[in-house]
């Protein structure tokens, strides 16, 4: 990040989040001074191989990636980006998802990914909020609302037909598309995928350029190529085939010291590049200057080739495939008769049709409901004053709350005290209602909401109850759609009704109470607490490696609907019984972040659910609590239990030490953290 920021490039966080200490001061306008060491910013416990920074250096990665696991994706993370990249696939293992082994999830990685150290983390093969091009357009809209200043990028893998997909991406209002080649070098990928999946970036890039030009879409979107790019010659060829930008990964890693031992997934990298072992990390010898020098050589080679071609401006190279030719590099019988005409083909389009990006996408943000909400919330955003009002919402109002949350985080990176902003709404929340809702905002909706409600929630609160005109049984009626609370990292949600499929998929720390779910509830969950007061669908807890779910098993058949390959089903004991039979180190953490008995956690959440939604089911369970508690089943992931045992054996806490941003916030004189300020919680009358 330091090297790329020095030369005006962009570094990519990859999947897994970024330490707020790397960007929080920069966004506040506090520059890095000469002589500052990187450990001064991130902390001695995080940095092993230390080095000195220059005045004006930046540790912020300008490209923030949003992958299927949504690890570390918070409102603040998105707000700190110049570009937000949706990783649909990667060249080394297209369409396969991934897994970070528990052995590589250190305290610091657990902090960044909102997980418990030692717990393996699974990235699903698909984005569970993308099943069509319309869903992709929705996610692009969500991210653009969270950060209006950032470009939205979509990463695709070179394959036959990728041009058609890229055209759909452009129509979905993406600002940028990446075509990744099959040579992707992710060291933790399966060897079979690295060797056999995907096609060269040259083929995918040529098809993308031709398709976009023919459909008059090329002017609206920037195209980037990557996949084992190493030289200035690669850059020029990429530009001639239609690329505006170029991604480098393996070559800069080698410059920093990578010797390609193919041990990335084993945590035993001998040069400290891809390991969390502090002894091995101390061997890291890379410096920002090494990467800067490498890119100067790449740029110089590209300049020389441009001079040979008689091209003055790099923009004039883009799409000039007519300047490419072939010559025999090898003699091989398989290469005989190959025809490259389709790669070098120039689309038959009028001369005035642009071959590169010359305009920006219209995302229609001026028409968003959040524009009105932000205006009403200015006293809270600018001065921290409490704001409370009512507003109507309709299902055409998409992504309500994301733009407001982004604005809040820009003024108050740590969020605001609870319920500083309280908005009571009536009607139907559209897609992604309450997405990325920041700390200090409460949405109290009387009505219902569509798919993706609470996606990426980052400390806010959502409470949804049926309309006062509703006369049915909430336990038998859907109140929120599919894929609710996808990747939510903190905050709480209360739904008086049934949720659709994939409720709380990839939940990373938020708390939720619902009165029933569809299939695949709590799939790939890694943290947080879920309470289900009614019946679940099939395949509950598939891939669940962290957090805890409490399910009311009225008919005694929940075990047949639960996927127990990674979880154990336990009774919810009274506090006295649990203290007598269970090591306190294995107790789940409540809202305050300290271990509590299951009885206390569960009862408190049901009480909160009743307070916020007036749930009849919650009242019924509380009125006969001892009998109700006996019918609850605790879904406890085996990985989580093992990690807690190991941490207890080592005498460690499950929360990592404060990093630079947290330490500086704690030590700032005369300033109280938002979390230190208490305010009474109560729903609107």
Regions found by a protein language model. Give the residues of each.
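A structural signal for short secondary-structure junctions
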Residues: 78, 217-218, 298-300, 524-525, ...
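Long hydrophobic segments that form regular secondary structure
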Residues: 149, 242, 302-319, 324, ...
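Terminal amphipathic helices with adjacent charged low-complexity linkers/tails
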Residues: 13-72, 79, 103-105, 155, ...
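Alpha/beta enzyme core
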Residues: 71-226, 230-261, 265-275, 303, ...
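Short acidic (Asp/Glu) and glycine-rich catalytic loops that position anionic groups and cofactors
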Residues: 10, 116-120, 145-146, 184-188, ...
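Long, distal/terminal scaffolding or interaction modules
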Residues: 280, 292, 306-309, 318-319, ...
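Conserved internal helical-beta-strand scaffold that buttresses enzyme catalytic cores
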Residues: 1-150, 160-162, 350, 357-368, ...
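Catalytic cores of large soluble enzymes that bind and process phosphate-bearing ligands
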Residues: 76-78, 97-100, 104, 124-135, ...
